[in-house]
Regions:
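C-terminal region of N-terminal signal peptides and the immediate post-cleavage residues
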Residues: 26-45
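Hydrophobic alpha-helical membrane-insertion segments, chiefly the h-region
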Residues: 13-31
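Alpha-helical rod/repeat scaffolding segments in eukaryotic adaptors/tethers
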Residues: 60-67, 91-100, 122-126, 151-155, ...
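Alpha-helical segments in soluble extracytoplasmic regions
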Residues: 85-173, 222-223, 233
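An amphipathic alpha-helical core segment
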Residues: 161-221, 225
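A cross-kingdom marker for long, charged
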Residues: 37-39, 211-244
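N-terminal export and membrane-targeting signals
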Residues: 2-17
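Immediate post-signal-peptide N-terminus of mature secreted/exported proteins
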Residues: 47-105
Length: 244
């Protein structure tokens, strides 16, 4: 065996080692890139999901800006109605000193709702609706007081007046627009609202807190339907006030 042969035998293993090292390096780089891409995809998907959750719900399709704004305004007013009603029920049941302030804010909401119809039906009609809604709240407070005290007679009296007032509110709206707010429809909507709110109050006073929360979920769903019924009626009755 010559010196050249020995040299060639030494070179070949070195070359193989070099090639293997190169292959290992390439594989390692590829694996690293794949992991990086996977992480990037995962974080990107997570960020996208978070951004999607943070975005507000899409507005109803087909509504022009003026209609959409009014639709949202009416929903906000009635969401405030059930939100402050719930807070009033909870603070009353707990004996919280915050009840008075909460009830005051709830009464302000009734004025806001009455004001919302004034551009269409006039100041007198708006003030009348506010007065009816104020009675709706003050009678509800009497009902809560009677229920907490266990005064059956006072509870029945307040309940009778509360449901009669609900019919008065429904009849007022039906008289304002019998086409879009039929009396039977409005009475049924108001009765459902009262039934649900009464269940919420009874559960809260009895300490059935999970049931009270579930009651509120139903109340919230129903009040949005009612708000849409009201806003749709006004937009159809006064199309000139909602240009495309």
């Amino acid at each position: 065996m010559t010196t050249a042969d020995i040299s060639r035998k030494r070179v070949i293993p070195a070359a193989v080692v070099a090639v293997v090292a190169l292959i290992v390096a390439v594989v390692a780089m590829t694996a690293g890139e794949q992991r990086a891409n996977a992480d990037s995809h995962r974080y990107s998907a997570t960020d996208s999901a978070a951004m999607s959750m943070s975005r507000p719900a899409q507005p109803p399709r087909g509504l022009q800006p003026a209609k959409l704004a009014f639709h949202d305004q009416m929903r906000k007013l009635w969401e405030d109605h059930v939100t402050w009603t719930r807070l009033a029920i909870v603070t009353f049941a707990d004996g919280s000193p915050g009840f008075g302030a909460t009830a005051g804010r709830l009464l302000q909401n009734q004025t806001d709702i009455g004001d919302a119809i004034k551009p269409f039906y006039g100041d007198a009609a708006g003030n009348q609706l506010t007065a009816l809604l104020h009675d709706h709240i003050t009678i509800a407070v009497e009902l809560l007081q009677a229920a907490k005290a266990g005064d059956t007679a006072a509870l029945q009296d307040a309940s009778d007046r509360w449901y009669a007032n609900a019919n008065d509110i429904a009849d007022f709206l039906a008289a304002a627009d019998p086409v879009h707010w039929p009396q039977a429809t409005m009475r049924a909507a108001m009765k459902t609202h009262l039934d649900q709110t009464l269940a919420e109050a009874q559960d809260e006073l009895a300490g059935n807190y999970a049931a009270s929360v579930a009651d509120y979920e139903e109340i919230h769903h129903h009040i949005l339907e009612m708000a849409d019924l009201l806003s749709n009626g006004i937009m159809r009755a006064f199309p000139q006030d909602f240009p495309n």
